[in-house]
Amino acid sequence: WASGAGLAAGPDTPAGSTYIYAVTGDGDFTANTGGADYGDSFVKLTTGLVPSAYFTPYAQACMNISDQDFGSGGVMLTANTGSTYYAVAAGKQGTIFAMNLANPGGYTAPTNTTCPATGTNANIQSFTGSTHPYFTTPASWKSQIYYLPMFGAISRYNLNLTTPPTCLLRPICTGTAVKSTVTFQYGTNISISASGTTTGTAVLWAAKSSGWPSTNILQPATLYAFDAEHTVSKAIPELWDSTKCPTRDQTGNAIKFVLPTIANGAVYLGTMDRTDPTNTRGELDVFGLTSAACN
């Protein structure tokens, strides 16, 4: 279900055909025995929507019975790493998986028959990105990937572009990822705006709700802008947020999984009208550059 994320699409090799890629939540898994069920799986589909290949964690049975969806977060294709193309996805276990698109790895049964499962996933790189689950889709710009776990900070990882990479996401294997100083609750998605690949133009956007799930009360979102490229005091620096001038910039009430959308020099954020007592009327907040002072 991917927390509102869409599907991914692209070739599986430099000269390969285009495929559609999805990640699924809990459910039956029978693909390894010729069945049609792909619970907790990364699935590679032809453009005719026929499964072509897949990856399923060896712990799928345990994940399924304990509500540990692989597909609670969306799937994203990474920047090209030489002749090998990858996708990344992460779910409720807090594990980030990197799949080789040409050969996602299939399924390898665990070495035990009880939970927690033990074993090895074939042709897969996996990393413990967080002790909390992921309910978000990652974002990327050039060779950088950004991930946000529930109740955590945004983490920035640099792709290892060697061929083939022995460790696709360098900081997870060799050190600590750079993180934002702001932490986020459940339901925040992140996006990037930039002037193409021009250095110094990349901005990372995220909309935070402080009301749900801690109080279950609707509250205005806070839209944040971060410097997507640089590091200040070992952290991702904040550039701006919508609480700086609340009389002008306050948003409507936050909606989980809403993605800040960038087009034509503006940022669009879907919210709920905070003046509506029935909480049924939507609101579209639009942010852009201004020279006007806050008043």
Kindly label every feature range from the protein language model.
Residues 1, 9-21, 26-72, 76-295:
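Extracytoplasmic/lumenal domain signature
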Residues 5:
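Acidic/polar loop-and-plug regions of large Gram-negative outer-membrane beta-barrel proteins
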